[in-house]
Amino acid sequence: DNTVIFLFRHGERCDRSDMPCYSDKSGITITGTEKAQQEGIKFATIFSEYDIYSSNAVRTIQTAKFFSGKDPVVMDSLSDCNNDLYKTLESIARESHKRNIVIMTHNHCLSFLARDRLGKKFKPAYLDALIMHYDGTRLILDGKYNKEA
């Protein structure tokens, strides 16, 4: 049994869209909230039990709330899109006791992980995700989460 970590890019940014905002420009659009909610409902049909985390950005926190219907655990370190991110992910995985983990993060974090672990370019769209697992000693990046499966 491994801890599985799903790292999602946040919903549609309000400051880069002409769509109506859910709150202010630092958050996500109303369309972003609807898509996050739809994605969360779909996800919960496959993975009913999971813990939800978010970086400290308004857009990731809003996405996490609409995705899960719960307040996420907010961690500033989930915005560190460099080698420090691995320490944060390992810490979350160790404390999870083999539960599924969903993390709302940023496109540059996902791009960093794909480049660093797989040597691949990854330009995630809103709500695209990568899957990792923690085998008790190390983090392994499995690839892109196929939402259509």
Predicted regions and their residues:
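Glycine-rich phosphate-binding loop signature in dinucleotide/nucleotide-binding domains
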Residues: 45-47, 94-99
